[in-house]
Amino acid sequence: MDSSPVTYSGEPPYKLRRLSPSYPYVSKLRERCASKIETLSEGSARDSLEEEDVSEAMATGAFLATRLYLPSVLPQRITTLTFLDHFKKSRPLPNSDKRLNPIFYRLAYIRDLVGEMELEGIVERGTASRLLGASSPAGFVAGTYTHARDLSKTMSLASVRDAVLAIEAQTRDQSESQLWALLRRGLATASTMKWGALGPQYHPQWCEVSTNAKGIPNNPALQFGQTNERTARSLISALYVARSEAATPDLLVDPGCGQCFVFDESASVPGDAYACGLLMDARTGVVGASLDMLVCDRDPSGVLSPHSTQTTLDFFEIKCRAKYLFDPDLFSPVATAYANLLKHRTAVCLRKFLRSIKNPAVEYFAPTSVPGATEALITCNSSWKPREVNETNRRCGDFDRDHIALNLDASSDVWLFSEPDLESETITPARWDTGELALSVPVFANPRHPNFKQILVQAYVLSGHFPDHQLRPFLVTFIGRHRKRCEEGKTFTICDRPEGSPYNLNEVVHSSCAIPILLFVTPVIVDREGCWEDIEIESLTAFNKTADAIWDSDSPADVSEPTSS
């Protein structure tokens, strides 16, 4: 495992920063494009536009008529069209042929699904064939069944990747998107995989389990996470993600008007520029993952497209801990510990605050032992040892033990936030007693916890799309409190330092969100050399077993020419 520091070639458009100056920016390009669109709509002025102006507008996504669109809200009939039902209509290949890569069965399903949307009139005609890279998109014909064998003969690796990335761009609303929920059914995820002593394993009925899985539970803890995830994303953006001082040529509008970048303004709410949709494994089409936050450029169509100078992709999995939620106006152990933490701002007070509840978010385990699987953050540092420690004889397999060793020396950044400034309506990080804004603590991600497995699968899926980029995953833990009466209904802008001005006016704590108290940012190290191949092989094996079970109970191989539009 290569744990050497990451280096950049050239000046990347993004970088993770800590305590570096904030770079204010201006985004006037879209205003210029909008004015050009108005001019283009007037026939008398069309001929007066210079050719370079038209080219610039097209290059920046001004002509949105050609942009792919798939709806998030679907008719009831469409929501019942699952991958498994579509796959059950497929036929095995003749014995003389090799097995197809499962990705083509997945794309065949997506083509027919989008085709049904065409028939419903909720997407433009030709969208289904255009999504899969057809040079001359044709309208979908009712009754068509697309065969994977057809696609395997016509689609290149590049067109497969383009189709999968286009789907990601159309499902960035995640749980608020019915399309996202439908496409996840029949995909293996970290939660549907089983993890044995040697790594990932599949349930024999993995596809059925995924297809019939219930929706996301509507309990208070998950509601808290869904509400406050965008606050955590805004905090990460304000505290860590900085634009480079050097403007990159393809993002620069006019050297004479300063550094004007095209920022992704297509997200549903401000601060969600780095939100991701459903990414399917480009290697097999069996595994899916939805990242909470990926620092990466997007092209004018909204598709992920890292800049040529960006060699590293940073992504963040966000967890909001509802169990620390408290009312600051009520006397309680948590409120008292928080008041002391805000007053003294020491590592000792931090530990006391974390232990002010029954099951702290950071678990201590002895260096000669192994951690449990309950908490996502762990430590074996003696300074974090509680007065009473329950001795256990836990065991874990080589897979988890190896990852514990890889992450043992990692440390977390901990950010403490001051009380909101009601006059300026801002929230800023508070300096610790050491003078630092980010306190480094010997706390690392727990390989035995489901969050770690989730990040591992996300890294695997992302690496299939961007194999030449080094991945840097982080686990983000957000802790917030209830609002005081004087804070209710207010939206607070996030500053990156006490004496600084807001880095981005879109990075805010919305009125419906909790007031931030603490933010843990924990690097996650995965053994990609030992994991990627295992996941790929297990995925292919699981799919083939599912296919054999379906085909063995059905009719013999269809050796005739497939029927496809």
UniProtKB/Swiss-Prot annotation:
The keyword Hydrolase applies. Keywords: Endonuclease, Exonuclease, Host cytoplasm, Host nucleus, Host-virus interaction, Hydrolase, Nuclease. GO terms for molecular function: DNA binding; endonuclease activity; exonuclease activity. It comes from the Viruses. The keyword Nuclease applies. Its EC number is 3.1.-.-. The record marks 229, 292, 317, 319 as: Required for function. It is found in: Host nucleus; Host cytoplasm. GO terms for cellular component: host cell cytoplasm; host cell nucleus. InterPro entries: Herpes_alk_exo, PDDEXK-like_dom_sf, Restrct_endonuc-II-like, Viral_alk_exo. Interacts with major DNA-binding protein; this interaction increases the nuclease processivity of the alkaline exonuclease. Plays a role in processing non linear or branched viral DNA intermediates in order to promote the production of mature packaged unit-length linear progeny viral DNA molecules. Exhibits endonuclease and exonuclease activities and accepts both double-stranded and single-stranded DNA as substrate. Exonuclease digestion of DNA is in the 5'-> 3' direction and the products are 5'-monophosphate nucleosides. Additionally, forms a recombinase with the major DNA-binding protein, which displays strand exchange activity. HAMAP family: HSV_AN (MF_04009). Belongs to the herpesviridae alkaline nuclease family. This is Alkaline nuclease.
